[in-house]
Each structure stands twice: as structure tokens, then as C-alpha cells.
Amino acid sequence: MPILKPKLEVPLSSPNLPVPIMFRSAVAPAEGIYPLHQHAWGEFVYSFSGVMEVKVADHHYLAPPQYGVWLPPQLQHVGLNRYEAHHCSLYVGPQLCSALPATPCAVTVSPLVRALLEHLRQQPPGQDATPQHTRLLQVLLDQLVTAPRAGSYLPTSDDPLLGTVL
């Protein structure tokens, strides 16, 4: 009997973001999957614990806590994880994406970026409308623009023999 994987709801289905930069955090259960989707905005995916996986066409990106994954606007992707993962997404309006990569990539997460993401995760609901919150999101975006790129971070394979080695 096949094991059913929990399908996670794609967080935003609206064609537009309510604000230019938006932060969202969640806990994804083991074997969770965000089905194939795309949005009009860019997305930076980060995992506080566990490893988030992002599949884009025939590329597979892994995001352990040292890395995040940048996804430019209008890119179809699937998000998944093998074990429970505490993760977040930074949604970036298309008007702010020009300084970020035009293709998906793994991004090195500096201690400052990690601290900003952790701070945002700890904020109570309703803080996202304040000028201070907006400035903090802009600083985070500025840091991501200059962060080193890391390709896909780790090699992966669907081959059963290679999969055990990798």
C-alpha cells in the first residue's frame, strides 16, 4: 500500500501580493509537498530546521539551514521535504526582483540574514503593517541581493544506486 504524502496548501493564490515584500513562516510535516505552482512574485525559501527541497523543471535544489533557494517570478516549482521542516518564504514583488538572479539558485545565508529571518519569525501577527517591519524586510532583501550564490548546493539523483551515495 503506498504511503500518502500530505499535500500542503499553496499559501497565496492571489495574483498580487498585498505588500511589495511579504514574510511567511510555517511548519511542513514529514513527507509534505507543496504541489506544482507558480506566482507572479519572486520567492526566497529558507529552512530554520530540516531541509526544504524545491524542484524546478529538471533541477532539484536543497535548502538546509546554511542556504536558501531563490525562485524568480513566474517559475513553476514544487516544494517538498522528507522530514518535518520549520521554514519560511520571503515573497518579493516583481517590481523589486530586477537586482536578484533571473534564474533559480541556492543562496548562502549569512549570520545577519539568519538573524533577520529568525527575528521576523518571532514577531506576533499584525506586525507586518508597521513602517519598522517594512524597513526590516527591505534590509533583508538588500542582504539577499548581495549574498553569494551556490548553484543547486548539493547533487541529487533519482537513480537508486546514486541516490544512496548522495
What are these regions (language model features)?
Residues 95-119:
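Double-stranded beta-helix
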Residues 74-104:
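Ligand-binding loop in jelly-roll beta-barrel domains
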Residues 1-51:
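Generic protein-terminus/edge-of-domain signal
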